[in-house]
Amino acid sequence: MAVQTLDDLLNAGVEGRAVLVRSDLNVPLDGDRITDPGRIIASAPTLKALAEAGAKVIVTAHLGRPEGEPDPQYSLAPVAAKLAEVLGRNVQLAGDVVGQDALARAEGLTDGDVLLLENIRFDPRETSKDEAERTKLAKALVELVGDDGAFVSDGFGVVHRAQASVYEVAKLLPHYAGTLVDAEIKVLGKLTAEPERPYAVVLGGSKVSDKLAVIEALAPKVDTLVIGGGMYYTFLAAQGLSVGNSLCEESMIDTCKALLEQYADVIHIPQDVVIADSFSADAESKIVSVLEIPDGWMGLDIGPQSVRRFAAILTSAKTVFWNGPMGVFEFEKFAAGTKGVAEAIIEATGKGAYSVVGGGDSAAAVRQLGLPEDGFSHISTGGGASLEYLEGKELPGIAVLEG
């Protein structure tokens, strides 16, 4: 069954109706300062459209990983302030999730008002393994919008989780995909259906174990699989080479060896790396061949030769998916690999390639390195969700919208 979208809901009419929206507002904070408001900005179009159409908008979202109880450091207060700024309208913040304050504020809403509930993960039922407990929370959320309410799923970053505000609540209300979720489904569908070739995938990040499923799913389907980041050193160890103090998953060495043998024509790995004598922004660093990593040193970025080789592959591709940085881009000394690969993808996009940045650290790197976001065809808001989609897994939050 086709997923109903926000347009379907707006066409049906929302004036005077309460609409519960599950947004992804899980932004990085430094104290109470938001360091990257990307997800808030991406969530705004759905909320704005509903408010302007006269809906009483009730937003639920999480921030960080609180332990199922209120924790001031994970309060959505800074998010509410930023959301109000982005929407250009007042955003109320409830003092609880589904308690007395949330109920009172929900009942007092007028057409076009926006209410943000406090961090949904302050309630242990949100992430409970017990479906009955999750359903109780979902029913409490439904009580806030009433019998005439609707549910809009717009948090793509959480659709791979069977959680109360993502899955159970969609079973209890007429449900729709928000602008963001609808766009993500279409974009990732384009990558899985018939991607234009050559199709290149760039995977980085720290652990092979985190990316193994997507490597195994994509390696048989793509023309080129570029591997960098911390996980690369396990592949290096699989070739019998010394990695010094670099990150290495001993338990994954045999797996990496098998992948390199099976997909020798597909997998491309760095030939040179930037190494450091310690994990710090001002560490002593040098560029070496991957054959020459000395004891006591660690690889923190791919080297310039590898950047040039990967750039040649990427600029000739017609479809590119990128997930995971090439190095520790947070440290300026070790950001060149990530920046170089990103710039090659931007160049490919300028030549007509279809490029998708798979959320998470990659999206953060684009913003932190000052790269133009519109240089890519699409920047996903869901790292884990986009990977699981490409692995071919069923995403509970999408499956329930189809029901």
Swiss-Prot record:
Catalytic reaction annotation: (2R)-3-phosphoglycerate + ATP = (2R)-3-phospho-glyceroyl phosphate + ADP
EC assignment: 2.7.2.3
Amino acids binding substrate: D24, L25, N26, R39, H62, L63, G64, R65, R121, R161
Family the entry assigns: Belongs to the phosphoglycerate kinase family.
Subcellular localization: Cytoplasm
Species: Rhodococcus opacus (strain B4)
One Gene Ontology MF term: ADP binding
Pfam annotation, one family: PGK
InterPro entries per the UniProt record, alphabetical: Phosphoglycerate_kinase, Phosphoglycerate_kinase_N, Phosphoglycerate_kinase_sf
Annotated metabolic or biological route of this protein: Carbohydrate degradation; glycolysis; pyruvate from D-glyceraldehyde 3-phosphate: step 2/5
GO cellular component, one term: cytosol
Gene name per UniProt: pgk
UniProt protein name: Phosphoglycerate kinase
